[in-house]
């Protein structure tokens, strides 16, 4: 990142990657929310991830485009708030490239799991859209990485990162049960599980791969005989006496 770019983002709490993700969802969602019913139907048909769109019509690209289409304005505000307050901390810790991988993997896993479950129960037209899977996955990641970090929730409620994670999980469970949004619940759960695997030191695939390579390298190492090199024989002092 150039000096000019660093100066540009230094005055903002949000980081570049989080800002781009927020801008994509905000732009596409506002287009949908401000459009008429006919335009909404067209946008949903070609951009929104549903079991019917993905599995019946073969519009697999909606697994990616649907991530940035949020129908609920309140949920959209929540997404922007989380992207502004908590997600930049993760991006600074990971770096932008790893942050993008986290967004892609958790969003894809969550959306695909939700659509698959919707197909199994016959809810073919239930949308699995928006950044919800990634948002809740980022809360889980924050609770794991910054488990003991003090957090002022909205500047009022003092919590630790782990307590914040448990609070969101409890709220999410109540929401899914109260609304019976089982498809979205599966999507959220799959994304959060992916986040836990990616951020946990015990279950992280990247760390497991590194540990396997280190163990393999150690198995191939041979113990070389140590000690001194060639030692010249001791001088016969009596022989050289004058």
Where in this protein do the model-derived segments appear?
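Hydrophobic core segments of transmembrane alpha-helices in multi-pass, intramembrane catalytic enzymes
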Residues: 79, 132-140, 187-191
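Membrane-interface micro-motifs in multi-pass membrane enzymes
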Residues: 124-147, 159-161
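A cytosolic-side transmembrane-helix exit/cap motif
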Residues: 122-126, 149-156, 203-216
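Membrane-helix boundary/juxtamembrane motif in polytopic membrane proteins
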Residues: 146-168
């Amino acid at each position: 990142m150039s000096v000019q770019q660093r100066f540009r983002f230094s005055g903002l709490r949000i980081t570049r990657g989080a800002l781009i993700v927020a801008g994509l969802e905000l732009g596409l969602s506002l287009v949908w929310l401000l459009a008429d019913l006919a335009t909404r139907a067209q946008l949903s048909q070609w951009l929104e991830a549903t079991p019917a769109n993905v599995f019946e019509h073969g519009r697999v690209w909606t697994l990616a485009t649907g991530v940035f289409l949020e129908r609920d304005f309140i949920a959209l505000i929540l997404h922007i708030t989380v992207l502004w307050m908590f997600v930049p901390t993760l991006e600074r810790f990971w770096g932008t490239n790893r942050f993008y991988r986290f967004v892609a993997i958790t969003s894809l896993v969550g959306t695909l799991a939700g659509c698959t479950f919707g197909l199994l129960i016959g809810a073919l037209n239930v949308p699995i859209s928006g950044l919800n899977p990634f948002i809740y996955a980022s809360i889980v990641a924050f609770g794991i990485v910054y488990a003991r970090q003090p957090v002022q929730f909205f500047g009022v409620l003092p919590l630790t990162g782990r307590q914040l994670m448990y609070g969101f999980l409890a709220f999410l469970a109540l929401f899914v049960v109260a609304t019976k949004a089982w498809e979205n619940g599966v999507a959220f759960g799959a994304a959060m599980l992916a986040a836990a695997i990616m951020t946990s030191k015990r279950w992280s695939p990247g760390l497991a791969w590194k540990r396997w390579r280190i163990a393999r390298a150690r198995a191939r190492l041979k113990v070389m005989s140590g000690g001194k090199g060639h030692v010249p024989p001791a001088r016969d002092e009596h022989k050289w006496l004058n």
